Design a protein with these regions (language model features):
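Active-site-proximal alpha-helix that buttresses catalytic centers in soluble enzyme cores
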Residues: 1-264
Length: 264
């Protein structure tokens, strides 16, 4: 009889409360979709894994360690699902680790990151728009994405375009570490005459970036910078992983996963 496992691979977070609301919620939804699979968790951030071990005594595997254990425990069918937003460095690292095990299981599949196909962009735009407050006159929403120097950073301007294309003219996409930056967006917010800006994280978890870089009290936080520019600012500290529609998308990606053997 075959042994089946579900391995959910996330960047990770050291904020335990928001982890349960986001990564934990996605994991629970995936487990419901694969009831005959034993659940396993892995993080790709070595820094977060180290912090959890030293602070809480909690042990979380990297994908390689989790797969090694599954192989040694005799599992034959493994479904992997990443909770990464873009097909960036962390996803590349995940694939490189999975490829080492492509011949160790009868089946080893991986579901795509959140934003992979055109349909993904359209669906995420609608979900992200519906989950935030209804806008009044002279109000806008600014989502903060992580950003990257990986070519997959193109995801963020593409997402901004998708919002506008679908009619969400008052929703903007920025990044902390990529393009477009806040400096690129502020002039347009001023030109359009917005008075109030809702800030929200375009990240699975409302963790360190959301709490500090977005909503923090330091003068270089997005909240403080926008306030200094004359905007009223309200922060919405909810990660994308809290949205049921996003959880459902990850389940669909897992159900339609690609065999790791087929990946380059």
């Amino acid at each position: 009889m075959s042994k089946k496992a579900l391995l959910v691979i996330s960047f990770g977070t050291s904020y335990l409360e928001t982890r349960e609301k986001t990564i934990g919620a996605i994991e629970r939804d995936l487990q419901k979709g694969f009831p005959d699979h034993d659940f396993r968790r892995a993080f790709t951030s070595r820094m977060i894994i180290k912090k959890l071990r030293e602070r809480d005594g909690e042990i979380v595997d990297i994908p390689h360690e989790a797969l090694e254990k599954l192989k040694n425990e005799g599992y034959t069918e493994v479904v992997c699902q990443t909770t990464h937003v873009i097909n960036g460095y962390e996803y590349d690292l995940t694939i490189s680790e999975l490829k080492k095990f492509e011949n160790d299981f009868e089946t080893l599949t991986i579901g795509a990151p959140l934003l992979t196909t055109i349909d993904d962009y359209n669906r995420v735009a609608k979900i992200a728009a519906d989950e935030l407050p209804q806008l009044k006159r002279n109000e806008a929403i600014l989502y903060m994405g992580h950003g990257s120097d990986h070519h997959a950073n193109a995801t963020y301007p593409a997402m901004d375009y998708t919002f506008k294309f679908l009619g969400y003219k008052e929703i903007y996409m920025g990044t902390v570490e990529g393009f477009p930056s806040l400096d690129h967006i502020i002039p347009e917010l001023k030109e359009k005459g917005y008075k109030k800006i809702y800030l929200a994280p375009f990240m699975i978890v409302a963790g360190d970036h959301a709490i500090n870089d977005m909503a923090g009290d330091d003068e270089d936080s997005w909240k403080r910078i926008l306030e200094a520019e004359g905007f009223e600012v309200e922060c919405v500290l909810r990660g994308l992983g809290q949205f049921k529609g996003i959880q459902d998308m990850f389940l669909e990606h897992a159900k339609n996963g690609t065999s790791v053997r087929e990946l380059l």
